[in-house]
Amino acid sequence: VHLTGEEKSAVAALWGKVNVDEVGGEALGRLLVVYPWTQRFFESFGALSTPDAVMGNPKVKAHGKKVLGAFSDGLAHLDNLKGTFAQLSELHCDKLHVDPENFRLLGNVLVCVLARNFGKEFTPQVQAAFQKVVAGVATALAHKYH
């Protein structure tokens, strides 16, 4: 992912304020509610039958935290996203058989959650930088599929 110095600074500044536990759970929960077909990868998580059940599910929250932890690692290695996510790409491709389109969907949901959480601070410029990052992460996670 190619970001300008200004974009890298904007991403780092905002990400430093992100509560990974809360935002991760909300982003994954929203993915499962907005795109219900993604729930098939999380059948072991139990109750996912209603939006409230999904958003309140402790396993969804815990996995969302884990996902955002990996995303944080990616932010520390923006110049080597494919290497950073190589093992996760292989896991999601070979063992979990996740549709790589889901990575793009989750990235876009994450951007929505950041906008909701940060309001005016999430300027169009900050959004543009984050869109580049989530697109780069989605591409890196889909790398083993090609």
Curated annotation (Swiss-Prot):
Assembly behavior: Heterotetramer of two delta chains and two alpha chains.
UniProtKB keywords: Heme, Iron, Metal-binding, Oxygen transport, Transport
Family membership: Belongs to the globin family.
Effect after changing E6K: In one allele
GO MF annotations, alphabetized: haptoglobin binding; heme binding; hemoglobin alpha binding; metal ion binding; organic acid binding; oxygen binding; oxygen carrier activity; peroxidase activity
Domain of life: Eukaryota
PROSITE patterns for this protein: GLOBIN (PS01033)
Identification of the protein by name: Hemoglobin subunit delta
SUPFAM superfamilies hit by this protein: Globin-like
GO biological process, one term: hydrogen peroxide catabolic process
Residues covered by the Globin domain: 2-146
Residues the entry annotates as binding heme b: H63, H92
